[in-house]
Amino acid sequence: MSELSDIRREYTLGELHSEDVPNDPMDLFNAWLEVVRDSQIQDPTAMSVATVDENGQPFQRIVLLKRFGDDGFVFFTNLESRKAQHIANNAQVSILFPWHSIDKQVAVTGIAEPLSKTEVLKYFMSRPKESQIAAWVSKQSSPISARKALETKFAEMKAKFSKGDVPLPKFWGGYLVRPKSIEFWQGGEHRLHDRFIYTKVGDDWVRSRLAP
């Protein structure tokens, strides 16, 4: 345990000043995402999505951000997955973008809303064909006997859909997370981190600085 407790580093890659924080959190998110992409971080759109089950037990998993805008953050998934079942019972979720290599992270709380079939179909048809086929193969979050079962099913589906378009599975869709709060964290020297949180009040965003 002592070896783990000795692991530390200083955060020296920047500061976040009040005058540099815009009124709209999506403007800041867009600016930070550009920094992330320019820094060539692997999987810059990877985000942890947390849901809770009917007993209040939290679960997390990594998904990829596929769109964001004034309305919120979008991801796609199997609608029979554990996270989709959780969202059906409790649509309150949280998202974390862990950009640790550049001393930044963004934490979001919000409500997950199902996307329209039109938007889901548009994105599904933009995916590589192999990814479309994989959506048919995996009954996400259910137990399987071995990886071989997945590979066999994939081969079967690949043959089945060898010609023409792969249809959209009824059990595949996506969510828009409408944010209620968005917190930006910038690592600071001597652990004096900069934290700003935006909270949605009506149609407006209220911005506050938080102690580290």
UniProtKB/Swiss-Prot annotation:
GO terms for biological process: pyridoxine biosynthetic process. GO terms for molecular function: FMN binding; pyridoxamine phosphate oxidase activity. It is an enzyme of class 1 (oxidoreductase). Its cofactor is FMN. Pfam families: PNP_phzG_C, PNPOx_N. It catalyses: pyridoxamine 5'-phosphate + O2 + H2O = pyridoxal 5'-phosphate + H2O2 + NH4(+); pyridoxine 5'-phosphate + O2 = pyridoxal 5'-phosphate + H2O2. Binds 1 FMN per subunit. Substrate binds at residues 8-11, 66, 123, 127, 131, 191-193. Pathway: Cofactor metabolism; pyridoxal 5'-phosphate salvage; pyridoxal 5'-phosphate from pyridoxamine 5'-phosphate: step 1/1; Cofactor metabolism; pyridoxal 5'-phosphate salvage; pyridoxal 5'-phosphate from pyridoxine 5'-phosphate: step 1/1. Signal peptide: none annotated. FMN binds at residues 61-66, 76-77, 82-83, 105, 140-141, 185, 195. Keywords: Flavoprotein, FMN, Oxidoreductase, Pyridoxine biosynthesis. Catalyzes the oxidation of either pyridoxine 5'-phosphate (PNP) or pyridoxamine 5'-phosphate (PMP) into pyridoxal 5'-phosphate (PLP). Homodimer. Belongs to the pyridoxamine 5'-phosphate oxidase family. This is Pyridoxine/pyridoxamine 5'-phosphate oxidase. It comes from Shewanella halifaxensis (strain HAW-EB4). The lineage of its organism: Bacteria, Pseudomonadati, Pseudomonadota, Gammaproteobacteria, Alteromonadales.
